[in-house]
Amino acid sequence: MEFWGVEVKNGKPLHLDPGLDRLVHISQVALGESKNNVTEPIQLYVTVGSDKLLIGTLSHEKFPQLSTEIVLERNFALSHTWKNGSVFFSGYKVDASDPEPEDLIDDQLEAAGFKAAPKSAAKQVNFQLPNEDVKAKQDDDADGSEEDSSDDDDSENSGDEEEEKVTAESDSEEDDSSDDEEDDSSEEETPKKPEEPKKRSAEPNSSKNPASNKKAKFVTPQKTDSKKPHVHVATPHPSKQAGKNSGGGSTGETSKQQQTPKSAGAFGCKSCTRTFTSEMGLQSHTKAKHSAAA
């Protein structure tokens, strides 16, 4: 490596050739002295082949010099726009075939009075395990991969079992819902008409309460025991019933209580107004109610 520097005068581009297997490194550009106070900006150019590139802009007041990092390996030309002075380009040349140009640069800098940056003292350490340790580590890795694969298989199997369980539960729920629907449909069926009671049973309130007849459709009548005494209440004649309804509710009810059908053969109590259908019932009533009073 050798120092390199040129002066580029005004109005003329400077053509340069790095040479065979040589590189030119431009590191600094500075303006020359000026007799007149120049305030205009000065532009710097480098031309390589047919390409003209702007390096930078200098000014005597603000930027009289410029640091660059330009490396050229073939013919080039330097130029500027200053009409009253010269511009100086400096750097160094390097042999392109040199295997270690950095060492040459450091030596040149030290010779020029610059201290090169110290190289890092840290060395790369290659951590290499012994063969036995490497083999053991590979075995451990293989075992770990097998365990991971077995865990994955177990998780997949458990996932399949859970899916089957869920489908079974959904099927059972559907069966239960279908059974419930069948039960509801059976309950909604029209109930069978109950058998008509025997003629012997009394129906005194059939004309008074028509609503009771509707309820009788849903209730199975109980069979009457012929052995037990039965209280028979006479049903009034329709013509009499109509007269009672037109005459008033309270008068009709009083007349019903006072009427005793004699044609039915009822036995009446002499001490009170109660009637019975059999003599046995009358005797039981007399013993229970009136014998104690006598």
From Swiss-Prot:
- Main location class: nucleus
In residue numbers, the region (Disordered) covers 124-269
One of the GO BP terms on file = negative regulation of DNA-templated transcription
Zn-finger (C2H2-type) intervals are 267-290
Q: Which UniProt keywords apply?
A: Acetylation, Chromatin regulator, Developmental protein, Hydrolase, Metal-binding, Nucleus, Repressor, Transcription, Transcription regulation, Zinc, Zinc-finger
Which residues fall in a coiled-coil region?
A: none
Molecular function in Gene Ontology: hydrolase activity; transcription cis-regulatory region binding; zinc ion binding
| N-acetylmethionine: modified positions | 1
TM helices/strands, residue ranges: none
* Chain segments carrying region Required to repress transcription: 2-5
A Pfam family recorded for this sequence: NPL
Locations listed in the record: Nucleus, Nucleolus
The record's listing under PROSITE patterns reads: ZINC_FINGER_C2H2_1 (PS00028), ZINC_FINGER_C2H2_2 (PS50157)
The reply on keyword Transcription regulation is: yes
A cellular component term (GO) from this record? nucleolus
Induction is noted as: Repressed by abscisic acid.
Q: Which Gene3D superfamilies match?
A: Nucleoplasmin core domain
Q: In which tissues is it expressed?
A: Expressed in leaves, roots, stems, young plantlets, flowers and siliques. Highest levels in ovules, embryos, shoot apical meristems and first leaves. Also expressed in somatic embryos.
Q: Which portions of the chain have biased composition (kind: Basic and acidic residues)? A: 189-202
Compositional bias per record (Low complexity), positions renumbered to this chain? 203-213
User: What spans are recorded as compositionally biased (Polar residues)?
Assistant: 252-262
In this chain, composition skew of type Acidic residues spans 140-188
Briefly, what is this protein's role?
Answer: Probably mediates the deacetylation of lysine residues on the N-terminal part of the core histones (H2A, H2B, H3 and H4). Histone deacetylation gives a tag for epigenetic repression and plays an important role in transcriptional regulation, cell cycle progression and developmental events. Involved in the modulation of abscisic acid and stress-responsive genes.
What does the similarity note say?
A: Belongs to the histone deacetylase HD2 family.
What does the record note on quaternary structure? Interacts with DNMT2.
Q: What is this protein called?
A: Histone deacetylase HDT3
- What is the source species? Arabidopsis thaliana
Lineage at the top is: Eukaryota, Viridiplantae, Streptophyta, Embryophyta, Tracheophyta
